[in-house]
Amino acid sequence: MSFPTIAHCIKSYTMIRYNYLCINEVDMINEVVSVKMPVKEKIRILKNHFEPENATGREARLSLVTGIHGDELDGQYVCYEVIRQIKAHPELLTGTVDVYPCINPLGMDMGARGIPMFDLDMNRVFPGDNNGAMAEYVAAEVVNDIIGSDLCIDVHSSNVYIKEAPQVRLNEDCADKLLPYAKIMNADFVWVYSSITVREATLAYSLNKLGVPTLVTEMGVGLRINNAYCRQLIDGIFNIMIELGIWQGERPAVKEPIMSTEGQVDFIHAEHAGLFVSALGEQMGHIKKGERIGDIISPVDGEILQEIISPADGIVFSLRENPVIYKGTLLARVYAVR
């Protein structure tokens, strides 16, 4: 598959964000929900709906959601590329695809993780309330629109502090149902969470409880687009579409992910405040027990305050990106091969 430049991605995102309706042979941009704001403005959540030319209404349906956090931009490129490829080959579409590129448009406009002014994480208000405040109302309408999908993929980037390798995260309560999809998602890593740690007000938790199988993907770092990670996930999405009978294109080559449970993941935290300097450069991946992950240094007295050492043979799949750290800051996650 060919991938255009980020400039094309931004141009496409601008069109999707501000156009109200666009109809051609296979796609239609619909307004999912709108809420009036002060000074004659309003929040509008849009989706791009695709179906085959001779749809019967019995086709499998995939929903692709991103932009819940306004500082997560990888999903914008992913949406662009999925839309571009479907529009380039509508004859290969045999099912329904709904693309929701921006659930938190206020946050996206400001580059803020949550909803500006309200200091609210959009991913803590699902499944929402049709009679609730603005965020709850929007969340409820989005959930209602997604219900009926055969599968939902909720695409996230990390925040501006931690870089994540492409991964799928699952609640162990839903693992049996979701693992077959997670394994063909072209991720480096599949992390199965304990149900004790699950935040119940997330989109994924709510949809899974409502009967819509939902995968959560994480990759990259906030306010950036990692082309390689996006392309990896895009191949995974088309692989899923082929598996669901939604797409008749050539099946992409996907990697076999590393499978994990929470007990196999080591969390490495800082013991000192200072600057974290990675010894891994831009690369995460395999590491041996005792190898350096990085150092915490003091720019005042020129000393290494803490050497960050891998506690086990394994895979580094999360790594501190912002170098300014404090005692207790998460520096890395290592999947330990025991």
Predicted regions and their residues:
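Structured catalytic-domain cores with a bias toward divalent-metal coordination
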Residues: 2-338
